[in-house]
UniProtKB/Swiss-Prot annotation:
This is U4-theraphotoxin-Hhn1t. It comes from Cyriopagopus hainanus (Chinese bird spider). GO terms for cellular component: extracellular region; host cell postsynaptic membrane. Keywords: Disulfide bond, Neurotoxin, Postsynaptic neurotoxin, Secreted, Signal, Toxin. Residues 23-48 form a propeptide.
Amino acid sequence: MKVTLIAILTCAAVLVLHTTAAEELEAESQLMEVGMPDTELAAVDEERLFECSVSCEIEKEGNEDCKKKKCKGGWKCKFNMCVKV
């Protein structure tokens, strides 16, 4: 009985790990598609830079330190610009 239970749990763990790895591989392949131009990524970066600059200006007018503000997606507001963290 114990051996059967251990075998079932082992198979379930392997299945979960395999599924997770397959999902990561699929996500990476979608990101690395040849047809996806770099201009789309540049547009996102420019949008984050703009959002951060506006946020910093609002905070400066309120006499707060701009460096405390964090941008979304791994970006940080520093010196009135968005920088990758």
